[in-house]
Amino acid sequence: MNISKPQQRTLHALAQGGRIELERDDNGRIISADCLTRDGWALTDCTVAVFQSLKRKRLIASQDGGPYRITRLGLANLRAQLDNRVGAKAW
């Protein structure tokens, strides 16, 4: 499955314990998607388009109205990295 770099970054943050919280307008439409790491930092790569793409591919899901988290399918499609914070050139 083809996954773009912003989608990969978002999935890595979710795999490490992060979550996606949505903000909706009065009609129920999504205004913004905020990806928060387990440390509480916001990930700037996570946009509404990235969120919708990950949800469409069923790589993320929400349970009981909670924040969106990575699914088993998302973990299976995630490419392994030594450390998400360090580029390949640093090693």
From Swiss-Prot:
InterPro entries: YjhX_toxin. HAMAP family: UPF0386. Belongs to the UPF0386 family. NCBIfam families: PRK13687.1. This is UPF0386 protein CCNA_00226.
